[in-house]
Amino acid sequence: MPTVMAYHDVKDKDHWLASPKREEFFGPLGVTNIRTFVDPENPTRVGLVMDVADMDALVAAMETHAAADAMAHDGVLPETLVILVEA
């Protein structure tokens, strides 16, 4: 089960941190141990570290309208999204 790190910019850090959409979207994909991070020098840059059971399922899910809707709800700026997978 690889650990995945993702970071991106958001419109509102507090809204992003409080949102239930993360668990709603990633939970059914078998993603566990989700931890959130905030850049102390740029609070609109945030990130996640999570354990992913099925990378193919995650990649496919990230290309759906549900992913776009969840990101829009959370104020994620999708053009800034970077995903890194544990080597």
Could you describe each region identified by the protein language model?
Residues 1-87:
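Short S/T/G/P-rich N-terminal loop/turn motif that feeds into the first structured element of a domain
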